[in-house]
Amino acid sequence: MLANPLSQFLIKPIIPLKALGYNISITNSAVAMIFVSIAASLLLIIAFVNSKLVPSRWQAFGEILYESNIKLVHSIIGPQGKVFFPLILTLFLFISLGNIIGMVPHAFTFTSHIIVTFSLAMIVFTTTLVYGIYRHKLGFFSLFLPKNIPLWLAPIMVIIELCVFISKPISLSLRLTANMVAGHILLKIIAWSIVSLTWFFKPLPIALVIVLIGFELFISILQAYIFTILSCVYLRDVVNLH
């Protein structure tokens, strides 16, 4: 009998806790996020704590990670975007490691839950909002009114631009969640289908699963990269009011 492919996304309490009537249990999702946070921190510490002129493998990897993200920030936002680099690097590491660790059997993919990805998107959204108002004051609201728009069209354009601005965290989070859920469901279905086959027919599906795992690992990193690219684009809009 084929197992439910959605069961891998169930949030399960590991340490049940309640306080003042609220459920604050430590779940498999929380454990996965804590593990990823520690892993990301250790990765950066190992890479840069004893930096040398001739880099080790870990230092070389850390430098590639650093340079790729700082170039991404500079190319999209510009020199003023340097202030956002820690946020962008943190998002990339957290999402990519979360996606990759979710590929491990019995591990939990927390990026498959909209509440997690939406929270990450809201961090970006709040940053753009606060920074935009701090930097441009009332001029920030000109973002919702494109230049050279006829006066009679202005109210409609303001409403449209406002809706687009508000919908950004929704689209950002849904894109990541949908890709993670779809990929993991496909792998689960194919893996369980192999179990029901006779030994003679198993080599081909197993080879297919190996290829799909490699592809899913690529997608895991790609989705983290896309998330950070779009975050940079949203931040650029408030930096330059474009």
Swiss-Prot record:
CDD domains in alphabetical order: ATP-synt_Fo_a_6
Keyword field: ATP synthesis, Cell inner membrane, Cell membrane, CF(0), Hydrogen ion transport, Ion transport, Membrane, Transmembrane, Transmembrane helix, Transport
Role according to the record: Key component of the proton channel; it plays a direct role in the translocation of protons across the membrane.
Entries under InterPro entries matching the protein: ATP_synth_F0_asu, ATP_synth_F0_asu_AS, ATP_synth_F0_asu_bact/mt, F0_ATP_A_sf
Cellular localisation: Cell inner membrane
Subunit structure and binding partners: F-type ATPases have 2 components, CF(1) - the catalytic core - and CF(0) - the membrane proton channel. CF(1) has five subunits: alpha(3), beta(3), gamma(1), delta(1), epsilon(1). CF(0) has three main subunits: a(1), b(2) and c(9-12). The alpha and beta chains form an alternating ring which encloses part of the gamma chain. CF(1) is attached to CF(0) by a central stalk formed by the gamma and epsilon chains, while a peripheral stalk is formed by the delta and b chains.
Gene3D superfamilies documented for this protein: ATP synthase, F0 complex, subunit A
GO cellular component: plasma membrane; proton-transporting ATP synthase complex
Membrane topology: Multi-pass membrane protein
GO MF annotation terms: proton-transporting ATP synthase activity, rotational mechanism
Record's protein name: ATP synthase subunit a
Segments passing through the bilayer: 29-49, 83-103, 114-134, 140-160, 181-201, 206-226
